[in-house]
């Protein structure tokens, strides 16, 4: 019996005939109810950071552009309560298996970048010792995506421990 990694309800693994024909072997790690709690970014979003429901460049991106920083992010999901809980459990409580939840989505999203060199966001040695894994490279591993660790990060105060204002003033530490 396989359980949802979020709510621990039993996962129903009924395969559909069409999945067998097209050899769709996407494994489910969370139940349908939990998956529905994650909101995909809609068609209307900031063209720079993918902030949902922004029809043009958002104020945050305008701020960074005025400072000479080009913003080009691509988000798949909104940062809602479900996503906040996901990151809390995945990053801060060390539930490494949760890296499998979005591996398939990441793999699909990165297909158009197959000629690129993927470089995961580094974490400090101290954070790696504490957590036991790098959250970005773990998802890439589960998605079977090749990457290069080209950067190292200095030991500094975690972004999650800073206020928004402090994060905006922070320079890059890798």
Question: Which sequence ranges carry the predicted segments?
Answer:
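Glycine-rich phosphate/pyrophosphate-handling loop used in enzymes and phosphotransfer proteins
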Residues: 1-174
């Amino acid at each position: 019996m396989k359980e949802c990694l979020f709510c621990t309800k039993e996962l129903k693994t009924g395969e559909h005939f069409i999945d067998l024909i097209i050899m769709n072997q996407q494994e489910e790690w969370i139940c349908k109810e939990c998956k529905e709690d994650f909101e995909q970014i809609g068609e209307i979003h900031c063209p720079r950071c993918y902030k949902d429901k922004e029809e043009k460049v958002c104020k945050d991106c305008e701020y960074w552009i005025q400072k000479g920083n080009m913003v080009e992010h691509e988000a798949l999901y909104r940062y809602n309560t479900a996503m906040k809980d996901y990151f809390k459990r995945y990053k801060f409580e060390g539930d490494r298996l949760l890296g499998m939840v979005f591996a398939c989505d990441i793999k699909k999203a990165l297909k158009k970048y197959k000629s690129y060199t993927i470089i995961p966001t580094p974490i400090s040695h101290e954070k790696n010792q504490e957590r036991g894994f790098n959250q970005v490279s773990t998802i890439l591993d589960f998605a079977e995506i090749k990457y290069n660790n080209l950067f190292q990060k200095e030991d500094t105060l975690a972004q999650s421990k800073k206020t928004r204002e402090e994060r905006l003033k922070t320079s890059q530490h890798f």
